[in-house]
Design a protein with these regions (language model features):
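N-terminal catalytic cores of NTP/NDP-binding nucleotidyl/phosphoryl-transfer enzymes
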Residues: 6-61, 65
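Short acidic-hydrophobic, aromatic-tinged amphipathic segments that line or gate anion-handling sites
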Residues: 1-8, 76
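A glycine-rich helix N-cap at a beta->alpha junction
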Residues: 63-78
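Short beta-strands and strand-loop turn motifs
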Residues: 16-20, 46-49, 75-79, 104-109, ...
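Phosphate/ribose-recognition catalytic cores of enzymes acting on nucleotide-derived substrates
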Residues: 182-301
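Short histidine/acidic/glycine/proline-rich micro-motifs that form metal-
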Residues: 23-24, 50-54, 81-83, 110-114, ...
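Classical nucleotidyltransferase
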Residues: 86-192, 214, 300
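Residue-level signal for inorganic ion chemistry
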Residues: 26, 67, 105, 164, ...
């Protein structure tokens, strides 16, 4: 799959296009992508409205990772502000028809298009003028409720990982580059990988989690701390740092996909010094190891 950020780069001349925020790449979005990729005579193109300021479940890089293997051949990331500022007709003419060469456009049945908030029927009428047809996808529901980004955000904030998996259709992920931190983990005898994540990414509440880190086609069990480290007073900013079990390699600069599976405990300050910290860490590691061993057993079954 090709991922570009320039709408006017050379694109296929006959495309099937889906557009929107696709925040969460959840079951509803997956239904749209399935329809998008069903037209074998057209090139499937996904236009993602990229947010750089508003909070998001998934960044553009994370969306790219999740699109691999779906059948989508082109992902185009365009600034959300620019896309949303256009009225529906301008968007249909300049973006869908001229830039993306759309022959078929796939939208959810309740989609709104443009700054003037036109519906799918209005887009279909515009398509008659600009050379494309519109296909709608029914709303996807789970347990009687529409699957939505808002429902997923509530699950993230509540640390409801089973609910997240149900709505996302997979485990919640965080993606980023391993960056140099303060090396605070080393003084506790457990060097950690510090993940540089986008500042506008919606993360689970501060705490300790059981995770899998994906690098170069392999995955590694880990214990991840999201948030402040109250026992290290010189580190006042939130971090995402992972202690990888049975792993001792230099991975600075590597891209990591972090799957977050389970909440272990909240962040707390230890007054008893390094011995107390180490005792708690050992307890956490054993809990993470037990849980993640079962996760891996199921993955490899």
């Amino acid at each position: 799959m090709k991922h570009i950020t320039n709408l006017f780069e050379t694109l296929p001349m006959s495309a099937c296009v889906a557009f929107g925020h696709f925040d969460g790449m959840h079951l509803g979005h997956q239904a749209v992508m399935e329809k998008l990729c069903s037209h074998l005579d057209l090139t499937p193109v996904l236009l993602s409205f990229a947010q750089t300021e508003k909070p998001v479940i998934y960044t553009e890089r994370e969306k790219e990772y999740l699109l691999e293997g779906t059948g989508v051949e082109w992902m185009v990331s365009a600034p959300a502000k620019e896309m949303e500022a256009m009225d529906a007709e301008t968007f249909a003419r300049e973006v869908l028809a001229k830039a993306l060469h759309a022959k078929i456009v796939v939208v959810g049945e309740n989609a709104t298009i443009g700054a003037d908030a036109k519906d799918a029927a209005a887009l279909a009428a515009l398509g008659e003028a600009y050379g494309f047809t519109v296909e709608t996808v029914p709303t996807v529901c789970f347990a009687g409720e529409p699957v939505s980004s808002q429902a997923i955000i509530k699950a993230i904030e509540a640390m409801d990982f089973p609910r997240m998996r149900e709505l996302l259709g997979r485990t919640y992920i965080m993606q980023g580059e391993v960056v140099h931190g303060k090396a605070a983990g080393r003084k506790h005898g457990m060097p950690t990988a510090n993940l540089g994540v986008a500042p506008n990414k919606i993360s689970p509440p501060h705490g300790v989690y059981g995770t899998l880190s994906h690098m170069d086609g392999k995955y590694y069990r880990g214990m991840t701390n999201i948030g402040l480290r109250p026992s290290d007073d010189d580190i006042p900013i939130p971090t995402v740092e992972t202690f990888l079990l049975n792993f001792d390699q230099d991975i600075y600069g590597r891209q990591v996909i972090l799957e977050v599976f389970v909440y272990i405990r909240g962040v707390k300050k230890f007054a008893g010094g390094l011995a107390e910290v180490r005792k708690q860490i050992d307890k956490d590691i054993e809990q993470v190891r037990t849980y993640m061993d079962e996760v891996i057993r199921k993955l490899e079954a």
